[in-house]
Amino acid sequence: MDAAASIALEDGAHRVSVATVATRAGLSRTSFYEYFASSSDIVAELITEELESFSAFLEEKVRDVTDPSQAISIWVSSSLEYVADGRHLLAKALSAIEISRDQSAVIGMAHRKMLLSLSEPLAQLGVVDIAQALSLIHSATQSATTRIESGADSVREIENTRNFIVAGISTLSRS
């Protein structure tokens, strides 16, 4: 896995192949196939691992926060700081690689898991449609992620996105 991640970050995700990963890892291609059926399998596994790490990071940030609005605010800020400081680069690099529908479903579940730590704070705030709120939060943070990765001022993006989401959640909790 480390070999594939290094290749993706150093040479680009398009260079992640059975041959390059096996060579970098010091394995024969036959040995590689004992672990993964294809290069897209290793790409999907790398993305899933990255998202699981990201999710654990976010869960840790909000674990002991008792104020639900503060938990949401910290989650948004932390998720975008993670992007701004470059820890999201591997997932970004790998996202351009074509993967199977099953692999996409696994990655989609990992993305949704990242948002789960917000379910309880949203419920505590009286948000009725938690799924809608999570979808809106995801959309806003994804937009900010794209802007940060395109060179926008990360401090401003984080602050504006956090304020936008907190205000939006406040509105949802009143409706």
Task: Describe the residue ranges of each PLM region.
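Helix-loop "lid/cap" segments that line or gate small-molecule binding pockets
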Residues: K61, S77-A84, A93-E98, F164-I169
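Hydrophobic alpha-helical connector segments
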Residues: E45, E59-D85, I137
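Amphipathic alpha-helical packing segments from all-alpha helical-bundle domains
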Residues: E52-S55, I74, Y82-D85, S100-S135, ...
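Hydrophobic/aromatic-rich alpha-helical bundle segments in the mid-to-C-terminal region
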Residues: A91-S95, S104, G108, L122-V166, ...
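Short hydrophobic clusters on alpha-helical segments that form packing/core surfaces
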Residues: A3-A8, E50, S79, T141
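Alpha-helical DNA-contacting segments of helix-turn-helix folds
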Residues: A8, F36, D41-E50, A93, ...
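Helix-turn-helix
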Residues: A3-D41, E45
